Regions:
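Catalytic centers of nucleases
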Residues: 70-80, 130
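Nucleic-acid nuclease catalytic cores
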Residues: 121-128, 138-173
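A solvent-exposed, charged loop/short amphipathic helix patch at secondary-structure junctions
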Residues: 94-124
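Conserved catalytic cores of phosphodiester-cleaving nucleases, focusing on short active-site segments
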Residues: 77-79, 86-95
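Negatively charged, Asp/Glu-rich surface segments that serve as flexible interaction/assembly modules
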Residues: 72, 85-87, 126
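Basic, amphipathic N-terminal segments that precede the first structured/catalytic domain
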Residues: 1-72
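Short, low-complexity, polybasic intrinsically disordered segments
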Residues: 156-218
Length: 218
């Protein structure tokens, strides 16, 4: 995974070097996205492997422990929410050269890999909600100018631990005073359905105002 992005937050680079996975850190409510992450030049579809509630102690909750856990799970990478409890495991399943997969194809793709969630009923239900949300969200994102989206793989609406997303009601957002990061792991999938420059500039992620964010998800 270090072939795709480096991790610099709180010394995670030393843990990520040479590994096949990466740790996306949101312990302070924000992903480590300002520096150290390389833009993904190829398009990858990430599939949720498992959602698990794990009680990290302040000592255990560090990049090394998380990287070890991801390694044991044989995950390519994982995200966790600011709640410090729910981990959303994702696995790189496919690389697509086409940005035109429709929601039905994506649905079929996820269904093919749904067996990885059978150990968790909650995860299986959560996948259903992901599919439902994607079907409506992909259409919206196709209408956006690609420059309005960040090019970083870790930018996302916070999902996973949020019960609202499991109920398919609304997206969660991460509050940073008056600014909001467009934060959703859906973007990791959605980016395969829109036109994105093949070599995006290594700039800071896009910041959106609350009104701008609401306009995107309303």
């Amino acid at each position: 995974m270090s072939d795709f992005f480096e991790l610099t937050n709180r010394g995670t680079r030393s843990y990520a070097a040479g590994k096949k996975f990466g740790v996306l850190d949101s312990r302070n409510g924000l992903m480590a996205i300002s520096e150290g992450f390389r833009p993904i030049k190829d398009r990858y579809d990430l599939v949720v492997e498992h959602v698990a509630d794990i009680n990290f102690s302040p000592i255990d909750h560090n990049a090394g422990y998380e990287a070890l856990y991801a390694s044991e799970r044989k995950c390519d990478c994982f995200l966790h929410t600011n709640s410090r409890r729910t981990l959303v495991f994702v696995e790189i399943k496919h690389k697509y050269t086409s940005a035109d997969l429709d929601s039905a194809e994506l649905n079929d793709f996820l269904d093919q890999h749904r067996d990885v969630t059978k150990e968790s009923v909650a995860a299986d239900e959560w996948i259903d909600d992901v599919i439902d949300q994607l079907e409506s969200t992909i259409t919206r994102f196709k209408t956006l100018n690609p420059t309005e989206l960040t090019y970083y793989p870790c930018v996302n609406w916070a999902v996973g631990a949020n019960s609202r997303i499991r109920d398919g009601v609304e997206f969660s957002i991460a509050n940073k005073q008056d600014d909001f990061y467009l934060r959703t792991q859906f973007e990791l999938l959605i980016r395969n359905h829109i036109s994105i420059p093949s070599d995006p500039p290594p700039s800071n992620p896009v910041h959106l105002s609350l009104d701008e964010l609401k306009s995107l998800i309303s």
